[in-house]
């Protein structure tokens, strides 16, 4: 069995595509896997920052701040935000003089 499914052959009218065994279960499975792979790749590229940040930091929002004064909570939030802001930059700007 050949994995080649389409053969272009010259005819009097031009080039024709003859598909053989297009109902083969292996070809159908490969097509479905290929389409799913393409969809997952597109979603990954669209949402990579959100997905990988979630994997890196987990689903937790951080340690509990119960019983901690509001000023310390705000300081902690600012520290966490600065860490996330640093993580957002994938590119480094280099200025040449």
Curated annotation (Swiss-Prot):
Residues 44-97 are intravirion. It is a single-pass type III membrane protein. GO terms for biological process: protein complex oligomerization; symbiont genome entry into host cell via pore formation in plasma membrane; symbiont-mediated suppression of host autophagy. Residues 60-81 are annotated as: Disordered. The keyword Methyltransferase does not apply. The gene is M. One of its GO terms (cellular component) is virion membrane. The chain crosses the membrane at residues 23-43. It comes from the Viruses. A lipid is attached at residue 50 (S-palmitoyl cysteine). Residues 1-22 are virion surface. The modification Phosphoserine is found at residues 64, 82. Belongs to the influenza viruses matrix protein M2 family. One of its GO terms (molecular function) is proton transmembrane transporter activity. It comes from Influenza A virus (strain A/Budgerigar/Hokkaido/1/1977 H4N6). The record marks 37 as: Essential for channel activity, possibly by being protonated during channel activation, and by forming the channel gate and the selective filter. Homotetramer; composed of two disulfide-linked dimers held together by non-covalent interactions. May interact with matrix protein 1. The M2 protein from most influenza A strains is inhibited by amantadine and rimantadine, resulting in viral uncoating incapacity. Emergence of amantadine-resistant variants is usually rapid. When the channel is activated, one or more imidazole moieties of His-37 probably become bi-protonated. Pfam families: Flu_M2 (PF00599). This is Matrix protein 2. Forms a proton-selective ion channel that is necessary for the efficient release of the viral genome during virus entry. After attaching to the cell surface, the virion enters the cell by endocytosis. Acidification of the endosome triggers M2 ion channel activity. The lineage of its organism: Viruses, Riboviria, Orthornavirae, Negarnaviricota, Polyploviricotina. HAMAP family: INFV_M2 (MF_04069). Its main location: virion. Keywords: Disulfide bond, Host cell membrane, Host membrane, Host-virus interaction, Hydrogen ion transport, Inhibition of host autophagy by virus, Ion channel, Ion transport, Lipoprotein, Membrane, Palmitate, Phosphoprotein, Signal-anchor, Transmembrane, Transmembrane helix, Transport, Viral ion channel, Virion.
